[in-house]
């Protein structure tokens, strides 16, 4: 990760991430640890798009899926009992949400390209909600 990426990450962490993290905590109902591998979330030529794509790819689907799961007490309890951590990374440049999400041993992993199909938020929400409902 070069200086440009480090500057972007710092700015994103200071300006957008706190609000997104608060929304995740509110949606999930507790302060779930977020393990974000920031250094993997870059492709040089797309740096100018990340302010828009990061929330759409990594955070808004989590918020909406957690809201769907915690819509009732049964969902709140299941999530609180099962979810230990959310890990966000990009190791395989997945752009299809079916391949980008996994849930094992209490860890929800989001392994998605930082840019591809950014506007497909609803599809990611559906796949993520289905994954959680099947594994909680």
Show which residues each predicted segment covers.
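N-terminal leader/targeting segments
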Residues: 1-17
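Short amphipathic alpha-helical segments that mediate assembly, nucleic-acid/protein binding
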Residues: 5, 17, 21, 59-62, ...
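Extended hydrophobic/Leu-rich segments
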Residues: 8-12, 24, 42, 115-116, ...
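Acidic, contiguous N-terminal accessory segments
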Residues: 16, 23-24, 30-34
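Acidic/histidine-rich, surface-exposed loop or edge segments in extracytoplasmic proteins
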Residues: 30-53
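Auxiliary, metal-adjacent structural segments of Zn-dependent hydrolase domains
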Residues: 46-117
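Active-site recognition of the HExxH zinc-binding catalytic motif
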Residues: 110, 115-136
């Amino acid at each position: 990760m070069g200086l440009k990426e480090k500057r972007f990450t710092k700015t994103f962490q200071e300006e957008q991430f706190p609000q997104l993290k608060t929304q995740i905590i509110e949606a999930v109902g507790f302060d779930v640890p977020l393990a974000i591998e920031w250094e993997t979330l870059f492709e040089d030529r797309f740096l100018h798009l990340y302010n828009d794509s990061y929330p759409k790819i990594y955070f808004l689907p989590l918020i909406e899926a957690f809201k769907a799961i915690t819509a009732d007490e049964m969902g709140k309890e299941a999530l609180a009992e099962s979810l230990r951590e959310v890990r966000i990374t990009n190791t395989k440049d997945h752009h299809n949400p079916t391949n980008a999400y996994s849930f094992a041993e209490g860890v929800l992993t989001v392994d998605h390209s930082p840019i591809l199909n950014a506007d497909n938020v609803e599809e990611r929400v559906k796949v993520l909600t289905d994954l959680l409902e099947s594994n909680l």
